[in-house]
Amino acid sequence: MATCNVRCHPLFAGALVLAAAWLALEPAQANLSNVIRIVLQKGRHYDPGDLYLRRGDTITLVNGDENAVHHAFIEADRFAFDAGDQEPGKQATLVLREAGDFVIQCGVHPKMKLTLHVQ
């Protein structure tokens, strides 16, 4: 009976390389759920205006206006957040621990809204 080795089956060797690469990437994929997103508050709007996120992600709200104060908050049945008054250049951080759709509003600028879609 002939023995099989990697030299006799180059496709098998390629499959082994791909499998090893996939296994090496698996821990990195597990950590992708903890992503930090930067949201700019400037000109009476949030940029971006919609975000699709996962539980455990963090968003940082940065006041990019030179003179305007912002006041980001969320009021939901099972989740609340209040950044307080944010002077120009200041930032507030929020860790998303609940799944669902949430709207961040600005207490100073009522039409300023950011929709969060958290899975």
Positions of predicted regions on the chain:
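Extracytoplasmic copper-binding redox domains, predominantly the cupredoxin/blue-copper superfamily
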Residues: 2-6, 22-119
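Bacterial N-terminal signal peptides
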Residues: 13-22
